[in-house]
Amino acid sequence: MKILKAHEMSSIDNKTIEEIGIPSLVLMENASKGVFENIRKYFPDAKNILVVAGKGNNGGDGLALARHLYLNGFSVDIFLAFGEVKGDAKTQLEILKKIGIEPLKKKPDFKEYDLIVDAIFGTGFQPPVKGEVANLIKEINNSSVPIVSIDIPSGLSADTGESFEPSVKADLTVTFQFPKICHYLYPAAKKCGKVEVVDISIPEFLAKDVKRDLLRKSDLKPYKREPDTYKTKEGSVLLVGGSVGKTGAVIMSAKAASRAGAGLVTVGIPRELNPIFESLLIEEMSLPLSGTSRLSVFCVEEILELKDRFHALGIGMGMDRYEEGQDIVISLLEKWEKPILIDADGINNLADYGDYTPLKDREIPAVLTPHIGEFSRLTGYDTKTITYNQIDIAQEFSEKNRCYLVLKGARTVISTPDGRAYLFADGTPALAKGGTGDVLAGILTALIAKMDTEEALKLGVYLHGLAGKVAEKKLHTESVKATDVTESLPEAFREIYVN
């Protein structure tokens, strides 16, 4: 499912009307019917409803909705936020008057209603809200009455995750044909409540050039083992990292890689820390490399000498941030000619190095898996700007540096060297625990060892999020640990592969 910006939705609306030939009033009718059905679904006990309408098409949707409500036995009042309407909204108001519904002459007591419908501003609005309408929105929010927003909560921008003030805080948002960025990116998404997407007969192919997609289970291409397979055919991965105080990170990655289907998992760690790993790893093997409390740059040649044993390399988990670490990461970017994933301190060391030419010049694009703080170091953008615009900034970085990116957070963005982006919006706050990123790094390294990279990232991110939800259901949001996510991977696989 495509995720659109305001100008893209406007263009598609116009093409639907002018080129396809579906009249705007038909689209409005379909939209209002969709909102009506969702009100009946989510608010079955609401009988006394107020529609607050703006003067444009969003207001027109609200006025058409008022007609459907009235004709189906609801008690409906309409209040015009600007005291006037235009275009198709004016047509809808004239219809209402002919069936006996007149707009209220003064602002009502919002608390008297069972439900308020926000139809003030649509996707074309640019914040902030000013004047009397700003006060109106504040009063609606303060009423404690459930709110349904049409298309987007009034006061938000469709194109960003920023939560502008004032803006309506909806319990349900019903949008049309395609979701918008504000429906998913935080903190704006918290203003949207539950989001429902209604088909209003706009042809889907009109959005074919949009490079933003919502990642859903139906988009996945699960890997299937051949009946005559063997362990090395299922991917031999090398995970490099670990330092004093952070040995657990790469261990968690290794165990996750095994659970994610890697045929063989080897952990490359500083030689003096090997006894720790030998005591904690059973199914996975350890590879002692040059280094005492952390890896030495001499480990690069040791890794490259063994490159034929491995199909993919993951580096950075618990690695530490230091000058020699920069040399390790850059050298492997330049010399490792197979799939490579860079996580955690591997990313920090790359950011500290500051020159991403080795990233751009790779024949096989690298995979970077930063959280927003690490991505801030890579890009120079502050974390707030990234949070509000993470899809755009991820796409920009991947295209510019010819790499894959998995930008981790409450919403996870996968971006590709050709500028595509996939948004995973079905995770859980239970994953906000140390180590879950290391688990994801292990899952993804296992999958890129034997799958097309783009498909591997989509599958891995979805698996990780689903495993988090499985663990949360078995335990509790507060009690989930990173290792619980790993142990929940079998159930996540079953849900994707069987169901």
UniProtKB/Swiss-Prot annotation:
Pfam families: Carb_kinase, YjeF_N
Residues that coordinate or bind (6S)-NADPHX 2: G318, D438
EC number: 4.2.1.136, 5.1.99.6
Residue ranges annotated for the YjeF C-terminal domain, each copy included: 214-496
Highest taxon, organism lineage: Bacteria
Region: NAD(P)H-hydrate epimerase, residue numbers: 1-208
Keywords linked to the UniProt accession: ATP-binding, Isomerase, Lyase, Metal-binding, Multifunctional enzyme, NAD, NADP, Nucleotide-binding, Potassium
CDD domains linked: YXKO-related
Binding sites annotated in the UniProt record for K(+): N58, D118, S154
InterPro entries: Carbohydrate_kinase_pred_CS, CARKD, Nnr, Ribokinase-like, YjeF_N_dom, YjeF_N_dom_sf
Binding site for ADP: 408-412, 428-437
A single GO molecular function term of this UniProt record: metal ion binding
Residue numbers spanned by region NADPHX 2: 371-377
Listed GO biological process terms: metabolite repair; nicotinamide nucleotide metabolic process
Cofactor(s) needed by this chain: K(+)
Alphabetical list of HAMAP family matching this protein: NADHX_dehydratase, NADHX_epimerase
Classification via NCBIfam families: yjeF_cterm, yjeF_nterm
Name listed for the protein in its UniProt record: Bifunctional NAD(P)H-hydrate repair enzyme Nnr
Encoding gene (name): nnr
